[in-house]
């Protein structure tokens, strides 16, 4: 449905001005940012497509469709956005700029707080950094004794296994940062957040290695477009 066919008071922009942004859905807020659709695809339809689940192509394995929600969309880069018909350079640039602003905001605020007094902030931060990546990435959050963020480092990219992530490298980086604890994190581009046996085996291996240098593994978080899972909350750590 084209926005111009709606009564003026029902249009997203007018409703935002009258009632505030919290009264709008994710789709409506995104439609305001996109501004216009294309022939045969209204702006609301385009916004819905962007937020739809990402699905792997059966033939190539490449992701198609949307980005699985706001978290996945904000992680997408300009090239990934090209798979949505109707997103020209101007719209892609606007979306990527929003992503960068969100990243900078989180980078400024997250190190100033105790991460585990605000688990929502941790998940939002990880969703922005990993949620929409098309390939699997394993990273580590290095924390101080107050659970404040010292650094986040990517340790490996590709299919995750115990053989691909070397505990010694993680231990070396933890000692370099004088970390008291770490949070392990990796993404599942498929959209499924349930941990695999390889995830559980790797977590145990890293926990054992880091324990030898008095560094605690607080959690292993799995991130997918629009969702995440804490292995600690699931009783797997």
Swiss-Prot record:
UniProt binding sites for Zn(2+): 186, 188, 199
Keywords annotated in UniProt: Hydrolase, Metal-binding, Metalloprotease, Protease, Zinc
Keyword Protease assigned: yes
One BP annotation, GO: proteolysis
InterPro entries for this protein: MPN (IPR037518), RadC_JAB (IPR025657), RuvA_2-like (IPR010994), UPF0758 (IPR001405), UPF0758_CS (IPR020891), UPF0758_N (IPR046778)
Pfam family, one: RadC
Gene3D superfamilies assigned: Cytidine Deaminase, domain 2 (3.40.140.10)
Listed GO MF terms: metal ion binding; metallopeptidase activity
Record flagged with keyword Nucleotide-binding: no
Record-stated family: Belongs to the UPF0758 family.
Protein name: UPF0758 protein Aave_3773
Naturally occurring in which organism (per UniProt): Paracidovorax citrulli (strain AAC00-1)
